[in-house]
Amino acid sequence: MRKKLLVILLLLVVLIVLVVTRCGGKKDQQNDPADGQGFAQQSGKAELPAELKLGVVTEAESGAMQLEVERNGEKTVYVFSDITINDWYVPAVNYVVTNGLMSGTDVGGGLSLFRPNYGMTRAQLAMILYRFAGGEPVAAPRHTYGDVSSGEWYYDCVNWADTNGYIKPESPDSFGVEAYCSCEEVLAVLHRLAGSPESNASLEDYPYAPKVSETNLSAVRWAWEKGLIAEDECVWYPTQAVSRAQIALLLMRYDQLIGASGEAA
């Protein structure tokens, strides 16, 4: 009887150890999601780089993020009702809003929605990259695409991104303005913006390395080496649609670590 009890106790101990190990393991923090479905949450809070241009963040009475931005001597106050003061992406939202890269939607009553967990289309990414890199309208489009129409809000931005080779078209006839950006696609865009530097960094500690496409492998290696993505965050699934909050964080880190002018020394 005692032997049976001892065996049962040993089995229970092994089972508990396995459960605890799995719950604490980085691969369990984000299951293998269907591409483009949902966004994993970041485990830590983004660091706030003091040397970047930032606004003043306070907590509104409702508990929402309140951001005061000063531009050209005028102050603007944003209250993002869909962001709480403790959300991990608050520093990144501060950065992109203060620097005029992203803003959100005014919903009236002094409130705005940033929609941090929404995806981003390729046209939206082109517009933000255009602002980030200080782009200028090109004299003539490099190529004409069936889904890029003159007069659309994204026209100059898409033509600039296409002409400079930062964002690749989906096909010879379609730029793919309405398609949502994946994580590895955005990393590839930033890699090209930096001049496509070589990187042989190991992705051994990157949980989703086997999921990275061969086309974007060099870009992901570079992003990993530079610290644009980090192993302990468990949110950078290569083929998953990237969120607005994630893009805000990538832009903040790029500016801090590399700078919009190109590759860091």
Predicted regions and their residues:
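Positively charged n-region of N-terminal signal peptides that target proteins for export
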Residues: 1-5
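Sec-dependent N-terminal signal peptides
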Residues: 6-14
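Feature responds to low-complexity, polar/acidic, surface-exposed segments characteristic
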Residues: 6, 18-90, 103-123, 130-155, ...
